[in-house]
Amino acid sequence: MASSSSRTYETRKREPNPKIAALLVIDMQNHFYSMAEPILQNALTTIDICRRASIPVFFTRHNHKSPTDHGMLGEWWNGDLILDGTTDSEIIPEINRQVTGPDEIVEKSTYSAFNNTHLQEKLDKIGVKEVIVIGVMTNLCCETTAREAFVKGFRVFFSTDATATVNEELHEATLMNLAYGFAYLVDCDRLRRGLLSS
């Protein structure tokens, strides 16, 4: 669920700098379609805004290739994981059409887009210092990625209307926590004004 009431939690305001920002589109895959569908248009709008502002875009794809990469997720979710090569592992078609090349895809097998991936090297190579986070699930992979980005020294912008999870309570709890200590909250309108109005 996405929410506009997140402005209640906003403690700091800032706009992303398109010269040093990247957009991270987290796990917009068939497995999560029921959660992703309500925010699909906002996700597409955010991608379009960032492309028009010349902001690089990266798309994560969560999947497991073998039992050796299940880690704690296998225990926690009783083996109900996204397996590589299945329809569930594929990026939602509308989002997949926005991918311009294989270098934009980040394969991951944990909640974090940074853990055991090449994401940080990709970002460092092109001088990225800020990340904008959208996708699913707000309170798991999006939040973990945002927190880890902050700890790694990236300025974090977290979308309130292009992230979603299983219910409003969990979505709002993440927004409250991130606004308090980790991320600037943004939405499509703010990004459009901040990135395209100049």
From Swiss-Prot:
Primary role: Catalyzes the deamidation of nicotinamide, an early step in the NAD(+) salvage pathway. Prevents the accumulation of intracellular nicotinamide, a known inhibitor of poly(ADP-ribose) polymerases (PARP enzymes). May play a role in the regulation of seed germination potential.
Changes seen on gene knockout: Delayed seed germination, reduced seed germination potential and increased sensitivity to abscisic acid (ABA) during germination.
Family note: Belongs to the isochorismatase family.
InterPro entries: Isochorismatase-like_dom, Isochorismatase-like_hydrls, Isochorismatase-like_sf
Enzyme Commission no: 3.5.1.19
Record has ATP-binding as a keyword: no
Coiled coil: none
Name of protein: Nicotinamidase 2
Pfam family, one: Isochorismatase
